[in-house]
């Protein structure tokens, strides 16, 4: 009985407070909100720091939270290198996909050093850790909770973006330089479906160190939307390429535009490739990949027929005191079809003289066409008529 009475008393108080709040003048409510000293101090600190940063200067601290640098050929699709070094905005299917974080990341491990394994990125912004879907359950399957460098600075100078990373009492300084194919007056080579990340490591200690750099990726080429009948979907696989791997998705009869490949490879001849992460439940694949990073292993696993959840490449190296090492990670994609169509049925080909300024077709310009039999009537990216597949584009 006492419990019932207490509950009724609580509900009455809630009801009264709700009515009171509804009739309070807005000025009083505003005054109460603005009286929060912690909020005031944070706002003042932000305004003070914002006033200090010059236009187009280096980004650091809270200014890293929302900055992202697009990488990719003109009109060929793109991904973004964020201010912290994270890879996001993966948009390679002929349309923007700015909330697509594909699960690609670089890592470094220094042998014989306590806590020597790190994701080669700065600290994850608060809005990602607390505002993204599934973060209430710990963001399982993400790299948010893995060790990152404590300090990051970002500088954009098109077509390059440079991120400097440091950690107190850590023997290496790291730098990421991302860039797009861009050659003034060369439209074709500036429109290639590719981009690169150069990872540079410098030994700032006074002793030689043995390290393993690695780059990892979930097979994000599998479309988010597929036919409920799995037998009607194309095969999802990870294939080999020299010094790397290809994340691959085949098209199907009902969804030919699902076809796509994303190649990741390095310039290091001693690259070791794991073509198939551990296949388990929940986030076991990423957990096992992190174990290899933590132990500074170089794990070689051959490609499987289908269903590989992700892949990794490893580059071992040694740095003497003061030495530097640069490892280039190249990325090339090939998504030849789309489901995009605008306008009505095609009419008779317009007779066009390119020198007059009208838009001539590839055939009229004398350019070889990779697929002369394409008649689907949907948009095809320019590069798909120049290259037959991802290996030719790489």
Task: Name every feature range the model reports, one short phrase each.
Residues 85, 96-169, 251-293:
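An extended acidic
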Residues 11, 36-127:
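Beta-strand-rich N-terminal accessory domains
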Residues 1-6, 32:
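Secretory targeting signals
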Residues 10-32:
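N-terminal export signals
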Residues 34-53, 58-59, 162, 167-171, ...:
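Acidic/polar, glycine-enriched structural segments that form the non-catalytic walls/loops
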Residues 5, 11, 113, 123, ...:
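Residue-level recognition of alpha-helix boundary/capping or hinge positions
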Residues 61, 70-72, 154-157, 191-193, ...:
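A short catalytic or substrate-binding loop motif that flags glycine-/basic-rich loops and adjacent residues
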């Amino acid at each position: 009985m006492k419990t019932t009475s207490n509950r009724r008393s609580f509900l009455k108080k809630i009801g009264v407070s709700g009515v009171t709040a509804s009739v309070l003048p807005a000025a009083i409510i505003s005054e109460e909100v603005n009286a929060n000293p912690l909020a005031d101090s944070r706002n003042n600190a932000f305004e003070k720091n914002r006033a200090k940063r010059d236009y187009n200067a280096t980004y650091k601290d809270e200014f890293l939270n929302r900055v992202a640098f697009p990488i990719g050929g003109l009109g060929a699709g793109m991904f973004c290198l964020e201010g912290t070094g994270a890879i996001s905005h993966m948009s390679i299917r002929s349309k923007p996909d700015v909330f697509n974080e594909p699960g690609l990341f670089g890592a470094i491990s220094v042998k014989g050093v306590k806590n020597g394994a790190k994701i080669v990125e700065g600290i994850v912004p608060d809005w990602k850790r607390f505002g993204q879907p599934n973060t209430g359950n710990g963001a399982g399957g993400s790299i948010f909770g893995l060790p990152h460098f404590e300090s990051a600075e970002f500088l954009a100078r098109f077509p390059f973006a440079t991120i400097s990373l440091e950690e107190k009492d850590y023997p290496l300084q790291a730098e990421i330089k991302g860039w797009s194919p861009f050659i003034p007056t060369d439209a074709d080579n500036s429109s290639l479906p590719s981009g690169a990340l150069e990872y540079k490591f410098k030994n700032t200690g006074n002793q030689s160190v043995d390290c393993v750099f690695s780059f990892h990726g979930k097979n994000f080429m599998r479309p988010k939307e597929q036919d409920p009948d799995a037998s009607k979907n194309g095969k999802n696989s990870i294939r080999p390429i020299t010094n790397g791997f290809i994340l691959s998705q085949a098209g199907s009869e009902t969804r030919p535009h699902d076809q796509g490949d994303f190649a990741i490879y390095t310039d290091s001849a001693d690259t070791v490739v794991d073509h198939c992460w551990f296949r388990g439940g929940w986030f076991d694949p990423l957990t096992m990949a992190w174990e290899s990073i933590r132990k500074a292993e170089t794990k070689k696993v051959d490609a499987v027929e289908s269903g590989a959840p992700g892949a990794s490449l490893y580059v071992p190296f040694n740095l003497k005191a003061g030495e530097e090492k640069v490892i280039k990670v190249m990325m090339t994609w090939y998504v030849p079809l789309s489901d995009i169509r605008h306008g009505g049925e095609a009419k008779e080909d317009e007779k066009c003289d390119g020198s007059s300024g009208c838009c001539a077709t590839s055939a009229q310009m004398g350019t070889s066409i990779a697929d002369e039999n394409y008649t689907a009537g949907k948009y095809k990216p320019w590069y798909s008529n120049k290259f037959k597949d991802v290996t030719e584009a790489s």
